[in-house]
Amino acid sequence: MMEGQQHGEQLKRGLKNRHIQLIALGGAIGTGLFLGSASVIQSAGPGIILGYAIAGFIAFLIMRQLGEMVVEEPVAGSFSHFAYKYWGSFAGFASGWNYWVLYVLVAMAELTAVGKYIQFWYPEIPTWVSAAVFFVVINAINLTNVKVFGEMEFWFAIIKVISVVAMIIFGGWLLFSGNGGPQATVSNLWDQGGFLPHGFTGLVMMMAIIMFSFGGLELVGITAAEADNPEQSIPKATNQVIYRILIFYIGSLAVLLSLMPWTRVTADTSPFVLIFHELGDTFVANALNIVVLTAALSVYNSCVYCNSRMLFGLAQQGNAPKALASVDKRGVPVNTILVSALVTALCVLINYLAPESAFGLLMALVVSALVINWAMISLAHMKFRRAKQEQGVVTRFPALLYPLGNWICLLFMAAVLVIMLMTPGMAISVYLIPVWLIVLGIGYLFKEKTAKAVKAH
């Protein structure tokens, strides 16, 4: 373990097991559930519950694959390290940069959502103004130290978790006590055109947006380098997070869709806030809007942390400028936080230029980057496992269903891309994947050329 203050190129270990569990949980309870679920409900109806169960299973397989690797070798930069070591230098380079871009895009989507939530109270404030204000505040906090991040994220996540549990209990009470009015009945789950009102197709077409909700679970891997005891904390966090996610997602959506017919949900408001607003409970609606706002800020906070650590890892591998591989005397990678913030600031511009379509566009781009990310975790894990078997090493936290689980995940990713190609407004993000891979290829060649030139001198 690293004790005391480190200078130069060491991150400071300051995250406890409670921090790691809640960082992962906080990463997943965010805008995907609170805002993204609205468009899924419109298309899939109550079948959204089945969709979340399927995506949750895939996310769990991915988490266990990453978990197996991280427990054996806990390092900064998380799985790009494994892609590098077990797959090849381009795979490491590409996965690292893709992960960084993924979380920059997630950060942009969350800041956009913050703007939408503020409009619930102040419709006249443009989304770009709210995005700009919270952008400055959260980045300033992250420039303090990792303990502050851990504590802030811990309390952000606690608020979210308690609120979702309270909403499930309160919603359940409204439902079974009769206080929710005549429209609040469990039969809403199958009476309004059936459990799958638009058939299985309606659900399948929404799997990409559902997948957006599960992006963030891999944060467990990123926290490994700053965990006090990765061998114990990572397996514990990985296993417990998935049960909680299923309770929170499936439980909250089942209660929500029983309180009011799904047909009354609109796309641009959080269904959680809308339903209590419709029930005439303005206090609960306002309280829930505070919660969904906290949720978005919490995920954005995780993104700022995650981006800076990923970029730090890339710099240590020699895949990003060396200046980014330094930390200040408190163990904070200031340079990487500032560079990530600079790129994320584009979100303010996107919201200024296209306030209506900003969230949908960013969500589609996130899913494309997430597909690449999860596919690379699964492929890197297969290579990692083969290498360990050849060395005769028995890993301490084996992934589930290897290698079948890996193939199930890869088929799921391919299906999500096909669905996105068929979805208006999302296809563009799939067409950008080959463009992005070409950009990564050029970046990699430039890096190799520079490295050779330095060696020659």
PLM feature segments, named:
Residues V75, N98-A113, F214-A227, T282-K322, ...:
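Membrane-helix boundary/coupling elements in multi-pass transport proteins
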Residues M1-G8, H81-Y84, E110-A131, S163-A166, ...:
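Helix-loop-helix connectors at the membrane interface of multi-pass transporters/channels
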Residues Q6-L11, I48-I49, Y122-P126, I158-I290:
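Helix-loop-helix junctions that connect adjacent transmembrane segments
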Residues H81-Y84, G88, F120, M206, ...:
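TM-loop-TM module centered on a large, flexible mid-protein loop between adjacent transmembrane helices
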Residues G115, W128-A184, F214-G215, T238-I242, ...:
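Membrane-interface loop-to-helix entry segments
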Residues W155-F156, A323-V334, V371-P424, A453-H457:
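C-terminal membrane-solvent junction of multi-pass transporters and transport-like membrane proteins
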Residues K12, L35-S130, F134, V241-I250, ...:
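Extracellular loop-to-transmembrane helix junctions
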Residues M1-A38, Q42-G47, A59-R64, A76, ...:
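Membrane-interface "cap" regions at the ends of multi-pass membrane proteins
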